[in-house]
C-alpha cells in the first residue's frame, strides 16, 4: 500500500508557493502555455514543464477536459443514495463499471454509497435504476436526488 499503514491516509503532498501558482494558472485555463505560466510565476518554460510533469506523475493533479453534459444531450443528472447489505467496496466497483455512473463514493451516515449518474432523460434514468443499479446484489434500497439546477461546480480546492 505505497508504504502507508492500513487505515491511515497518505501524507499530503507539500506544495511550495510556485507549484500552487502553477496549479492555479492551469485551473483558470488548462490550455495556457508553459511560457505564459512561466511569466506569471517567474520561471522558465522548461522549469514549468518539469514541475507540471512532476505534479501529474505524482498524482497531485491532472489536466482534463470537462464537458457540459447538457450540451452533449444528457439532460438528466442525479445523485443516488444506496443502502447496502454487501461489502460496499465490491458494490462500489460494480457501480463504477456502469457507463452512466460518473462518481462513486463510500459514505458514513444514512447511505453507504453515493453514486452520481448522467442520463439522456428520465426514461434512461428509470431504466438505469430498475435494470442495473437496483439489480446489483447487496443493494437494499436506493433514494434518487434529481438535479434541478447546478449552481456551483469548481475544482479549485487544491491550492487553498
Which residues does each predicted region cover?
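A compositional/biophysical signature of low hydrophobicity enriched in polar/charged and small residues
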Residues: 1-160
